[in-house]
Structures are given as structure tokens and as C-alpha cells.
Amino acid sequence: MRKIFNVLLITAAIATSCGCSKKTVVPTPPADTTTVKTHTQSPPGDVVGKVIVGYQGWFAAIGDGSPINRYWHWTQIWEQEPSPTNTGIRSWPDVRDYTATFPTQYSNLNNGQPATVFSSFSDQTVDVQFKWMKQNGIDGAALQRFNPSGLEGPVRDAMAAKVKTAAEANGVKFYIMYDVSGWTTMQADLKTDWTSKMSAYTTSPAYAKQNGKPVVCIWGFGFNDDNHNFSAADCLDVIKWFQSKGCYVIGGVPTHWRDENSDSRPDFLGTYKAFNMLSPWMVGRIANANESDGFFVNVNKADEAYCYGNGIDYQPCILPGDLQGRQRAHGDFMWRQFYNMKRAGAQGLYISMFDEYNEGNQIAKTAESQAFVPAGSNFLALDEDGTACSADYYLRLTGDGAKMFRGEIPITATRPTKPMP
């Protein structure tokens, strides 16, 4: 998602609120002396007690039959094929499970196979990706919905229908997650889009319900940047409007929402408190296990306590790490977050993201070694630190993290998932 903010802002946020940075080592809290909180606001449902992945579904290609008919999100210049000088991604996908792929201007993979990419518009692509979710114990997907007007509107509408079909076929829940970044008439557009288009999906047996209500998430209220210029009053109006329509409303909010500083606008706490569930953003905030520990001690525990004290469910983010930035530590970084958020007492977990090849934070199948990367492309593979990992490793790791979160396996600071099955 388009959610990485100014580096100086992020650095300041980590330093002031966590007492740590990439150069500061925070001791790991002892696993055997920490009590796991069991706070609950809402009973188990389709988001409480569950692990949800953020699902972009925003890749297309020329010739895929999509309304956009461009290399949507694969490239900077969508009208041209992906190439080393025209790319929009940081990680290379593993495409072996897809029946239809599309050409690029990259050299062949190092194994000699053509370097091709998938299209999210293909029914088989969406189906196989939701099959991966089901096979790996992922409970649901939050379909990202950016401003559905203009050039991207028709393909985004089509993706909602495709996600519904795939979710129903594979027994995976889904819900709509609006990203309001850059919306200029946000209040009216959200209400119109929900009323005229998206609310119809709530009749699907696969549409997520919590407390008997259809789930909708709004990402972007309160962020302190020029892409989210909304007043607290306007945002509160939208939250209350969705709730008046019978929805359970999740807020994708700034990391420092509770203190109303750094990435959060001031005077927004009353708006944040109106959400039924809060999911603070974490991409760009931590890059290793030590920093996850720092956030657990200095931010997550206090966030959970505040939510509990105010009748709000808490759904923190977990990320695999930017592969190209060498953050993953063959899964140890992500596992530490599962461990810490379980100890924090979170009511739900949000994985950011499923298919975020653009920022290198995807858990979907990825090139496992240089054999599956275009020759001369400089993309790192999952084995970048010398540990061999299967293409589906982060799907399997997420599945084990979900089992631990749901109490199906004991809590442990030691990653149980083997990089190679």
C-alpha cells in the first residue's frame, strides 16, 4: 500500500516512542516470565480471534482482458512492459502456480525460464491465492479499495467480485478495506461507494461479520501528511455513518494514534475512539526483532491497555519485512512479532501484506533463490541471507503464527516453521 512515510518522521517516531532505532539493541523480554494477556472486548468472530491479510489485488497486464489493460502496479509506466528501467516492484513473484502469465522485458530467469508476471484480473490467479490462504490457515482477507473513480475504478470494481467468488469457493472470509489516501471528496465518495456498490457484498456467506455486523475498515484517518487532509469531525462523521448502517468499523490508524504525535495529527483521539477496532500501521516503523521488542514494551502493551479500557478491539499489524532491505532474517523477524502481539493480548492480527511486491513486504509466493529471479535484475530472493527458503515459506510461517495466536499451539519465542518443508 502507499503507506511508507517520510523517513525522518518515522525515525523520530521510533526514537521518541520506543527508545530504539536500527542502531539500538533492545533486550528480548524473557519468554518464561511474561504473562499473556487475555483481554477481550468482543466475542470471537471473523476478525476477533482471527488473522487477516491485507490483499491488494492490484496487478494487471496488457492483454489480460482487464478494463485497465496496462501493467498496473508492475511498472512506473503502465503502458510499457516491466523491465529493469521500468519497474514498480521490490520483490520478484514465484509464478509457477499460475496458468496465465504475461511477458516482460527482463532477461530470462537464471534457470532459463522466461521472466513473466501474473495478473490479479485472472480468475485463476485470485482463486489460487485464496487457496494458499485456506491451505495455510489464514482466516480472511481485507480487500484494499482505493479511490474507485477514474481510470482504476472499473478494474477495482471487478476485483471485488473476483475476491467474493474466490473467498466463497475456498472458505476464506473477506471484507472491504478502504484506503482514503488522496481522496478529495472523501465523505461523500465513501458513502456513495458503500451504498451503491460495496454494501451488496455483505450478503455473501464469505463476507466477514463481527458481533453480527458486516466488517468494513477505513485506512488513513488522522495521518499527519498532505495525503490525508481530513478533519477529525469529518472522519468521525464517516465512522458514525457506517455504524448507523449496521457495520463493525475498523480503523487503520497512525502508529502513534494514542499519543497524537509523530505520524498522527493532534486532536484526533476522540475520532480514533469511535472505531470498533483499531489497527495501527507498522510498515516502516520496525525492521528487526529488537525493534519489535522495543515497540512491544513501549507502544503495543500500552495500546492494548488503552483499547481495553475504552471498549475497543485491538488488531496490530505484523509484517514479514522488506525483502530487498534484508529485514526478514529468514522468518525470525516476523515470528518475533507474532510472539510479541500474542503476549500483548491483541484481539486480532493484521498481516501487511499478502501481495505487496511493490514494497517487498509480501507473504505470497516469492522467488526462493536466484534461479527464479531475472538474470542481472538485482532482485533478492528469499535465500538472501544464506538460508534456503521455499517460495511458500512466509505463507507457512503465517499459518503457524495464526495457530499460536488462536491457541492451537503453545506460545513460543522460537520459530517452529522450517524454511524448507
How would you name each of these model-derived features?
Residues 2-10:
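Sec-dependent signal peptide recognition
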Residues 4, 16-41:
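Bacterial Sec-dependent N-terminal signal peptides
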Residues 29-421:
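Glycan-processing catalytic domains of CAZymes
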Residues 11-15:
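Alpha-helical transmembrane segments
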